[in-house]
Regions:
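The substrate-binding groove and active-site-proximal loops of carbohydrate-active enzymes
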Residues: 1, 31-54, 96, 111, ...
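Long hydrophobic alpha-helices with heptad-repeat/coiled-coil character
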Residues: 60, 72-88, 210-227
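Aromatic-lined substrate-binding rim segments of carbohydrate-active enzymes
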Residues: 1-64, 164-175, 195-197, 201-202, ...
Length: 227
């Protein structure tokens, strides 16, 4: 084990969010489906920060003095879009959760705050007829029919990103202040909305993307997508 990566610059994968999200329904917003780009952790779960600290103690502390280690990838290709569009899909996934799910409770509180705690203002924005914000928990969907609705869902995505990158980067640096945080390897440039990139850039030394181009040797071209 002492010879592992000795003399070679290397990185360490932590899989903080993906490991947390595979622990059961209360721990994910989008479930793991035994394929890439499927899971997204419930960053609003009260145990998420503690799990990140546990994972950092386990995986980062042993590397804090390694001169050959470049840094840590937090995760790989999380489903920042839930199962829908990049800006609204995560909020839509939360709306499908059970009324007691902590992410749905967080979304209720977030939307109530945006409406200034006014259910009348909320109903006017969303075209609903709720008598109180707790009734939101019984709904399984909210529309994305206009800019204001999409903006609200996009800002909830920003909140989720802030909770994710704050908890993970803080846990990593607590155990290893000597190496870089290399982002969460978004699935291509479309694998997360730019608001997520912005938040990642505030917490990571490097924001990383996985891109899968292919080369046509006959044409002498490299394509970034099949189209």
């Amino acid at each position: 084990r002492r010879l592992n990566h000795r003399g070679l610059v290397h990185t360490v994968f932590l899989n903080m969010g993906s490991h947390f999200g595979t622990r059961g329904e209360e721990f994910y917003i989008a479930p793991y489906e035994h394929r890439p780009c499927s899971v997204f952790p419930n960053v609003f779960h009260p145990d998420f920060e503690a799990f990140c600290r546990y994972r950092a103690r386990q995986a980062c502390r042993p590397h804090r003095s390694d001169p050959w280690m470049l840094g840590y990838f937090i995760d790989n290709e999380l489903a920042w879009w839930g199962r829908g569009p990049g800006d609204t899909g995560l909020a839509d996934a939360v709306m499908k959760m059970d009324a007691t799910h902590t992410a749905k409770l967080a979304l209720r509180d977030f939307l109530a705050d945006r409406a200034g705690k006014s259910i009348e203002r909320f109903n006017a924005l969303w075209g609903t007829k709720l008598k109180g914000f707790d009734e939101l928990l019984a709904l399984s969907a909210l529309p994305s029919a206009n800019d204001a609705q999409r903006e609200a869902k996009r800002e909830f995505l920003r909140l989720a990103a802030e909770r994710y990158f704050t908890a993970t980067s803080r846990a990593i640096r607590r155990e290893d202040p000597n190496h870089m945080v290399l982002g969460a390897r978004f699935a291509g440039t479309g694998g997360a909305h730019p608001v997520v990139w912005e938040v990642a850039g505030q917490h990571c030394e490097i924001v990383t993307f996985n891109c899968y181009p292919f080369a046509d040797l006959d044409e002498g071209r490299v394509y970034t997508s099949p189209g």
